[in-house]
From Swiss-Prot:
Record's keyword annotation contains rRNA-binding: no
Reactions catalysed according to its record: pyridoxal + ATP = pyridoxal 5'-phosphate + ADP + H(+)
Pfam families attached to this UniProt entry: Phos_pyr_kin (PF08543)
Binding annotation for ATP: D111, A143, E148, K181, R208, P209, L210, V211
Subunit structure: Homodimer.
Gene3D superfamilies: 3.40.1190.20
Name this polypeptide is given: Pyridoxal kinase PdxY
Molecular functions per Gene Ontology: ATP binding; magnesium ion binding; pyridoxal kinase activity
Keywords for the protein's UniProt record, in alphabetical order: ATP-binding, Kinase, Magnesium, Nucleotide-binding, Transferase
HAMAP family: PdxY
Binding site for substrate: S9, T44, Q45, D222
InterPro entries linked: PM/HMP-P_kinase-1, PyrdxlKinase, Pyridoxal_kinase_PdxY, Ribokinase-like
GO cellular component: cytosol
Length: 286
């Protein structure tokens, strides 16, 4: 069984960050070691929340505790998501180096959350620069959405072809795999939800139906990153990993819609996460 050190935000109520990714990754058969960058009452898109950002040193101290009991060598991957400060990010890269020293085969999967102010997702000053200048170079796998892809790539992306070009340019800086979690306005169709998985030599495109909500649930990207990582650690081929991730997230969205809920209904959808009823084919791009 694979072990994932998941360094992300945590909400007490609802699902975002570790609160969105931890249970689905466990349901997929991975051991998850959740390490929280922030602890908030709820996610920030409610407009009101309480809680705190963890000191950057807290992250390092906790991981050192794991090293002290000689278990860091069993860590197969570090997954990072929302960070509360650029200083936290620098400490996370130190943790990645420490994990890789203990297990050279360990992967670093970076979900470079840079904030979407118009949706209420705000990151601290310096976080975007940290991702562009540091985490991108250290990551084995990076999973931006479209605005994050544009920031990382330093260009505007208008269509699928340009998204592939930009993702492949990122591969030249460090990552072996780039997952574009949501093509949004660069998608080939307005009525579909589309993603890309890009390596230096290959690219796959996948689409599924959009599930419309009055208020779009939060944590979908965190869920997506976690599921893809588990699939990759299991040795699933890239295209099949993308297909399962897409179908599993779709199952969660359908159940959440059916239950008329704002928060992702992960427990109710757990069987669909492990064994999706729907299938979407990843198309290899020439």
């Amino acid at each position: 069984m694979k072990n994932i050190l998941s360094i992300q935000s945590h909400v007490v109520f609802g699902h975002a960050g570790n609160s969105a990714a931890e249970f689905p990754m466990r349901r997929m058969g991975a051991n998850v070691w959740p390490l929280n960058t922030v602890q908030f009452s709820n996610h920030t898109q409610y407009g009101h929340w309480t809680g705190c950002v963890m000191p950057a040193s807290h992250l390092t101290e906790v991981v050192q505790g794991i090293a002290n009991i000689d278990k860091l060598k069993t860590c197969n991957a570090v997954l990072s998501g929302y960070i509360g400060s650029a200083e936290q990010g620098e400490h996370i890269l130190g943790i990645v180096r420490q994990v890789k020293a203990a297990n050279p085969d360990a992967l670093y999967f970076c979900d470079p959350v840079m904030g979407t102010p118009e949706k209420g997702c705000i990151v601290a000053p310096g976080v975007s620069d940290f991702h562009c200048q540091q985490s991108l170079l250290a990551a084995d796998i990076v999973a931006p959405n479209l605005p994050e892809l544009e920031l990382l790539g330093g260009r505007t992306v208008h269509n699928v072809a340009e998204a592939v070009e930009t993702a492949r340019a990122l591969c030249e800086k460090g990552p072996k795999i780039v997952l574009v979690k949501h093509l949004s306005r660069a998608a080939s169709r307005e009525d579909s939800f589309e993603m890309l998985l890009v390596t230096p030599t290959d690219a796959w495109h996948i689409s599924r139906p959009l599930v419309e909500f009055e208020r779009q649930p939060v944590g979908v990207g965190d869920l997506t990153s976690g599921l893809l990582l588990v699939n990759l650690l299991k040795g699933v081929a890239l295209d099949k990993a993308l297909e399962h991730t897409t179908a599993a997230v779709y199952e969660v969205m359908l159940v959440t819609k059916e239950m008329n809920e704002y928060e992702l209904q992960l427990v109710a959808a757990q069987d669909g996460i492990a064994n999706p009823r729907h299938h979407f084919q990843a198309v290899r791009l020439s």
